[in-house]
């Protein structure tokens, strides 16, 4: 045996026996199984574990039960199966020493060729399936140019007439105009939509592919029909794509593009041609929808009901963000029962107070009164007019003959009828919108009443305050004037004349700068060559010494001026004030005392003045020394 198996290249001679020695031969899993007689069977495990079912009656697979069944198949086998296998082995005994080969033997090269053929066959099938799902590629000829254009093969669940109006108006030439855009249902669309209203989406979408199913899955599948399981999975989260034929679903979604078509009414042929040349074959935003435009012969009419139309460019337009999965994605979703995008936006948008007041849901709710109700109202009006006659309506058209035949009519109103009408109106059920409006009206009414009460209360408070103010007004007028005067004086006093930033400038409030005046006074006392004439500021202020308002400044001792104080400013005006004060003091003393007393007083005054002058000279000398 060792000689029959050639040594493989690159293998050590010491390990050559691995390929021929039976000790190293791998045992089959089949030989490890334990043989069981007829007393034991797989059905015992199935009976032991009862399968649970979901709300649709389908069995729920339990991982533990499946594991036990798999272990049973792995480690046990029946006697009958073993006997059958032994018979088969006995019949098919192959003498490998003579070069015989079993019937089911397949070489590696054959495996590769067979796998290639299978894969090529599968690819051919897939390519055929993909070729089946296509849009209408063979576009007819454009034909003669006309004023009107037809737009086909768009996602009409999201595209509205106002979207087309906004898009095409960008390509209108000067002098042209789009009169209106209308969307009509096609014959194919009407037939399909009528069928879907009764049956729903086509049942072909939910058929299972049982070609490649394994035997295990066939055993675990229930007896439910493919149609029922598909519809159930459609409403289960995460199971919608399991039993849906993706190819049929894609074809259905592409067919929905042909349910409607739009007609663009242009003012002239130049406008329609410009739109056709610029838009045909282009993509609408990033939705994967390509504009497919066709010329419509002039004079062609459309009798179908208009789904929606647009004749004026809408204000505050916002395009819808969407994409058609059937045109660009591998996974396609069923949009048959999808909520319209407009309704979702209306539900999510926050309404203003005005929009709540004028809430209009006509597009989604049926109106309370139809045309038949209007006809009934007209008939009731005509009947009442016939009962009342010409009384109060055609009095100007009466003729003398009519006066002879005139008959008085008595009209009585019974309160019972009015009460009945009230009861009938009360018996009517209130809709949700009416309930919202009623509550909003009550809320607004309560808010207005509250605001009104607050206004009345504030007016009362104002009146009471005004009364109290009027009483105190006479007493407070004098205080207000005093406060104003003191405020003005404080503003002048609080002005900072020593501010470094404002030095050299005139104070706008006081109309002078005291620092500049003092510097100029010092410069005047210097000798001519040391003077800085450009810094000399002329003090043009002349105090009114005869003003009676400043009488106390010159006569009262409380306003005495001490030149030795550091706050003293030796200006021309201040010197005049000092002279005037001393003059008036002297005159006062002369009037009060005799001539002798006056002489002594004058001498004393002169001495005092002399002392003051000496003190000032000493201070000035000391200050000069310090500066040097």
Curated annotation (Swiss-Prot):
Residues 104-118 have a biased composition (Low complexity). Residues 119-135, 492-501 have a biased composition (Acidic residues). Residues 208-218, 440-450, 463-472, 582-592, 615-628 have a biased composition (Basic residues). Its main location: nucleus. Residues 192-207, 420-439, 451-462, 481-490 have a biased composition (Basic and acidic residues). One of its GO terms (biological process) is maturation of SSU-rRNA. Keywords: Coiled coil, Nucleus, Phosphoprotein, Ribosome biogenesis, RNA-binding, rRNA processing. Signal peptide: none annotated. Interacts with KRR1, NOP1, NSR1, PUF6 and UTP22, proteins involved in 18S rRNA synthesis. Also interacts with ribosomal proteins RPS1, RPS3, RPS4, RPS6, RPS11, RPL2, RPL3, RPL4, RPL7, RPL10, RPL20 and RPP0 as well as with the snoRNAs U3 and U14. Involved in the 18S rRNA synthesis. Required for the early cleavages at sites A0, A1 and A2. This is Pre-rRNA-processing protein ESF1. It comes from Saccharomyces cerevisiae (strain ATCC 204508 / S288c).
